[in-house]
Amino acid sequence: MISKKLIIELLKQLISFKSVTPNDNGAIDFITNLLVKQGFKVYVKEFGQEYKVKNLYGYFGNGQPNICFAGHIDVVPAGFIEQWKYPPFCATQYKDKIYGRGVVDMKGAISAMLSAVFCFIDNNNDFNGTISFLITADEEGEALFGTKKMLEWINKQGHKIDFTILGEPTCTDKIGDTIKIGRRGSINFDLKVFGKQGHVAYPHLAINPNHLIVKILNSFIGSKIDEGNEFFAPSNLEVVSIDTNNNITNIIPEIAQSKFNIRFNDIHTNEQLLEIVKKNIEQFTTNYDLQSSCRSRPFLAKMSPYIFSFKELVHKVTKIKPEFSTSGGTSDAYFFKDYSPIVEFGLLNTMAHKINEYCLINDLQTLCRVYYNALCLFLMSNSKFRTN
């Protein structure tokens, strides 16, 4: 039986590390010690210039397939501490819930992964293949010195990963309802529209950039970028700010500025979207400045038999038929696309990053069973599924 006590105890210990991105605050060393005691070979690597980020890669066993559990130990800030029912970095178990910053995103999944792996190794000494972990402390921030760098290092060492399970919170209503197999891209825009300053009583002597930028933004909002496809919803533009830096009520300002974001599917590249945006703006003005930055591009995982087998496994363990999805924000899954097939599967995402973040203990146990049975499925020739 997979130990409920172990899952909860590991989660409580992980929450106690105030690992606000990109500082792991000792969490990487804690996980390293756990893995070493279990017989893993573990490498801890630090990357970065102005600051160093700790990452670990550990493996147990040998040969193929290499089933990799991946995740991040860093969390977002707790926000207003006084609004929390319980201290955010001191996990509190109350009735059927555990509260704490990072419980959902994603220390709960890491505790479930560790518990599942330790139980599997203790009960199966004749499995074929390798079990590995890739854990970073740089996902919630810029993600420059975490998974991306670690995968490059792993590849240079000659390690091949055959299938990756990333424990991001993917489910919406019940554990088992959603498996992420890709992600949309994200591109940010900073638009400045230039007009001509003047007195509000003499608009014919000025050019109002506010009127121009409103027309531009309305044209974006009122039209579809695309219709989406089999795996992706339509690309979506959201205006996040509009500003003139003008508090004087009788002045038409010279500059209006807006920031907006497009979450986009694999129908477009970020370069194509930039041209679409420019063309739209130039229907109204040519006197503008546009800056853009693309943090991540859309991707769809390699649709290997591992992914379809995992989907069937989730259905069998949870009794819920999961849907493949590419919705939500960006994640480190993008970095795996050139190295292995990958699924993202974890806890419910409804409480991620929120005040009083919590998860249900039953959900942790269910998630742990899925991870355990994935190892049985992929590493044991005569696997038997656990339901407890």
UniProtKB/Swiss-Prot annotation:
MF GO annotations: acetylornithine deacetylase activity; cobalt ion binding; succinyl-diaminopimelate desuccinylase activity; zinc ion binding
Annotated function: Catalyzes the hydrolysis of N-succinyl-L,L-diaminopimelic acid (SDAP), forming succinate and LL-2,6-diaminopimelate (DAP), an intermediate involved in the bacterial biosynthesis of lysine and meso-diaminopimelic acid, an essential component of bacterial cell walls.
Similarity comment text for this entry: Belongs to the peptidase M20A family. DapE subfamily.
GO biological process: diaminopimelate biosynthetic process; L-arginine biosynthetic process; lysine biosynthetic process via diaminopimelate
Pfam families, alphabetized: M20_dimer, Peptidase_M20
Organism (species): Orientia tsutsugamushi (strain Ikeda) (Rickettsia tsutsugamushi)
Domain of life: Bacteria
Binding site for Zn(2+) 2: D105, E140, H353
Catalytic residues (positions): D74, E139 (proton acceptor)
Cofactor requirements of the protein: Zn(2+); Co(2+)
Pathway(s) where this gene product acts: Amino-acid biosynthesis; L-lysine biosynthesis via DAP pathway; LL-2,6-diaminopimelate from (S)-tetrahydrodipicolinate (succinylase route): step 3/3
EC number: 3.5.1.18
SUPFAM superfamilies, alphabetized: Bacterial exopeptidase dimerisation domain (SSF55031), Zn-dependent exopeptidases (SSF53187)
Keywords associated with the record: Amino-acid biosynthesis, Cobalt, Diaminopimelate biosynthesis, Hydrolase, Lysine biosynthesis, Metal-binding, Zinc
Reaction catalysed by this enzyme: N-succinyl-(2S,6S)-2,6-diaminopimelate + H2O = (2S,6S)-2,6-diaminopimelate + succinate
Hydrolase as UniProt keyword: yes
Positions of Zn(2+) 1 binding: H72, D105, E168
HAMAP family in the record: DapE
Quaternary assembly: Homodimer.
Lineage: Bacteria, Pseudomonadati, Pseudomonadota, Alphaproteobacteria, Rickettsiales
Protein name (Swiss-Prot/TrEMBL): Succinyl-diaminopimelate desuccinylase
Cofactor stoichiometry and binding remark: Binds 2 Zn(2+) or Co(2+) ions per subunit.
